[in-house]
């Protein structure tokens, strides 16, 4: 739920107008909209590069993943791993636009630990893949933009640990 929706729901539940503090938070959210959209556009435009380079970093750091017996061994399983990275990048992009972790939380994390555990996929590997995407993205963004995106990458990484 966005800051706008939360503020309205809270105010309405108390049958009151929005408070000055709520209006300030909404103003800040609206004012940061162009920046969030710019970040999302950069992530979207560079998604293939981000996923490919992050995959390369992941497989260098964790060769066990692509070795015989590893969860990303073989072309099909490597493609599945990269597909999962792309999925998390998409959710992070949604969260940047929303200015909230809810897209990551509600779309991407519900039941994910159980699913990966049932498949024998190490969560540490998934976290490392997301960390690798964060590293690639940090080279595409600067300053406040990088910090904004990093927050959502860190949230997803933390959920996998």
Curated annotation (Swiss-Prot):
Residues bearing PTM N4-methylasparagine: 71
Coiled-coil intervals, chain numbering: none
GO CC aspect terms: chloroplast thylakoid membrane; phycobilisome
Protein name: Allophycocyanin alpha chain
CDD domains in the record: APC_alpha
Modification after translation (UniProt): Contains one covalently linked phycocyanobilin chromophore.
Disulfide bonds: none
Membrane topology value: Peripheral membrane protein
Organism: Cyanidium caldarium (Red alga)
Subcellular location: Plastid, Chloroplast thylakoid membrane
SUPFAM superfamilies noted in UniProt: Globin-like (SSF46458)
Transport found in the keyword field: yes
Residues where (2R,3E)-phycocyanobilin binds: 81
Function: Light-harvesting photosynthetic bile pigment-protein from the phycobiliprotein complex. Allophycocyanin has a maximum absorption at approximately 650 nanometers.
Single GO BP term: photosynthesis
Keywords of the record: Antenna complex, Bile pigment, Chloroplast, Chromophore, Electron transport, Membrane, Methylation, Photosynthesis, Phycobilisome, Plastid, Thylakoid, Transport
